[in-house]
């Protein structure tokens, strides 16, 4: 099969990253977690006491993706590996705001396009099929119920030792959905030629196979 690019979009906790990793592994492709890029910039934003000059912030930022056989994708922010800090609560609560800023978006999208230029990429995010990879050979828009997404996020938090309640997480997810879908720059929306995959009630294996079937039908 010729080298292709696959775009996976969808709201928070729809399972994008998990499925993207599985699909990339099965196809021996490179997985790019674009959300981690925005989280890294958000981490720097928080470490710098929330500056509002985002253009200066990104101009003074270096961001590099590396791949570790045992740990997967790692994010180097200003030459420091910050991957293990990117799922902290304060980062999660601020990433939508930071990612909505035009200088941040431009900075990240340029890097994402460069990574995908040679094909063979599985990339997940919110605007991959619409903005970053509008010519991707396969575009998938993943959805799931708010209830299930909150349960998934709670399990992730438990694994990291982060206390949270389902009601709190449901509220946060609903608020983030609204923010992501209504922001001025690169709002979350399904590309016209994307295939919708509902992951509610499905196992990782079931969703992966569903997308592999789509790949095989290209």
Swiss-Prot record:
Catalytic function, reaction form = CMP + ATP = CDP + ADP; dCMP + ATP = dCDP + ADP
Name a Pfam family for this protein. Answer: Cytidylate_kin
Single GO molecular function: ATP binding
Location in or out of the cell:
Cytoplasm
Q: What's an example GO BP annotation here?
A: pyrimidine nucleotide metabolic process
Enzyme Commission (EC) number: 2.7.4.25
Keywords, comma-separated and alphabetical: ATP-binding, Cytoplasm, Kinase, Nucleotide-binding, Transferase
InterPro entries, per the entry: Cytidylate_kin (IPR003136), Cytidylate_kinase_dom (IPR011994), P-loop_NTPase (IPR027417)
Cellular component aspect of the GO annotation: cytosol
Q: Which residues bind ATP?
A: 10-18
What the record says about family reads: Belongs to the cytidylate kinase family. Type 1 subfamily.
NCBIfam families, per database record: cmk
Q: Which PANTHER family match?
A: CYTIDYLATE KINASE, CYTIDYLATE KINASE/PANTOATE-BETA-ALANINE LIGASE
Name-wise, this protein is Cytidylate kinase
Q: Which organism is it from?
A: Staphylococcus haemolyticus (strain JCSC1435)
């Amino acid at each position: 099969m010729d080298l292709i690019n696959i775009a996976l979009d969808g709201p928070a906790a729809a399972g994008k990253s998990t499925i993207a990793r599985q699909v990339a592994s099965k196809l021996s492709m490179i997985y790019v977690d674009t959300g981690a890029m925005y989280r890294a910039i958000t981490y720097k934003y928080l470490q710098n006491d929330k500056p509002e000059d985002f253009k200066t912030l990104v101009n003074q930022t270096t961001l590099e993706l590396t791949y570790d056989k045992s740990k997967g994708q790692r994010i180097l922010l200003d030459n420091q590996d910050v991957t293990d800090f990117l799922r902290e609560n304060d980062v999660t609560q601020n990433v939508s705001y930071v990612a909505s800023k035009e200088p941040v978006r431009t900075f990240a999208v340029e890097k994402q396009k460069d990574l995908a230029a040679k094909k063979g990429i599985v990339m997940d995010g919110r605007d991959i099929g619409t903005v970053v990879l509008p010519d991707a050979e396969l575009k998938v828009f993943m959805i799931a119920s708010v209830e299930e997404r909150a349960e998934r996020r709670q399990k992730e938090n438990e694994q990291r030792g982060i206390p949270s309640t389902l009601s709190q997480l449901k509220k946060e997810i609903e608020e983030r959905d609204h923010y992501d879908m209504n922001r001025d720059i690169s709002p979350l929306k399904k590309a016209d030629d994307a295939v919708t995959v509902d992951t509610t009630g499905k196992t990782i294996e079931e969703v992966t196979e569903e997308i592999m079937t789509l790949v095989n039908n290209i």
